[in-house]
């Protein structure tokens, strides 16, 4: 009687090269360290499609969550893996001397090196903002009243008289900032559209973390040492003010970013309202 051998292991499904590298990177940099894989080896996460190429479907390169947009020796720009708006990217410094510092402390430094770093971050964030603004115009310009003349020329419905009309300034719809209490260990700047329209925005904390003082915008830096959004060790006075968001706004009322309507803790009602506001915002 033949003896039974050990069952053969089931073959693992074969993914693409990007998937394999990404999985390996995620195993090395897990949880709060996950952004480290982009800093460590950004070329592994570029994917197969580059900016400016023609997408195979309605999604463009800027909608590929978790992929790198661009990088150099000093910074990496990536698509947020869990975008909370129509376009949402992260800017990651690559300098190991600073990338584990608290972003509020780092961007509030007033010494020469701190000023130089903050200026470099602002320059790179503006570049990323321009990229995202272009993506907003590409996606939503056809709906915008301010882009009507430009879109008519692009469609061939109007003659081009001189230069192509600039149309809507979509860069004004893009916000840049860092969280007062970041969820990831590596310094990362959020660069995102203000519409807050995404299936990945699933609860109150998500919404309030981007629409309250918990998000410190880049043009607010440097913060004063006693600003309540500073880490406790840095502050020179008392505890957190009720006007800040140490808990990412878990207990704050949710207010529409566009009209200011207060939804209290009624998240699903807010989501339905944001769908309506999104359509109106596109048409401005």
Language model feature labels by segment:
Residues 131, 141-151, 209-236, 240, ...:
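Long, charged, low-complexity intrinsically disordered regions
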Residues 107, 134-169:
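Intrinsically disordered, low-complexity domain-flanking/linker segments in eukaryotic proteins
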Residues 92-97, 105-115, 192-219:
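Aromatic/acidic cage segments in peptide-binding pockets
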Residues 80, 88, 100-103, 137-145, ...:
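Intrinsically disordered, low-complexity regions enriched in proline, serine, glycine
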Residues 153-167, 173-175, 186, 192, ...:
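Conserved, structured regulatory domains from eukaryotic proteins
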Residues 1-108, 112, 229-284:
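Active-site microenvironments that recognize anionic phosphate/pyrophosphate groups
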Residues 93, 175-196:
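Histidine-centered divalent-metal-coordination microenvironment in nucleic-acid enzymes
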Residues 90-144:
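Short histidine-centered catalytic/ligand-binding loop motif
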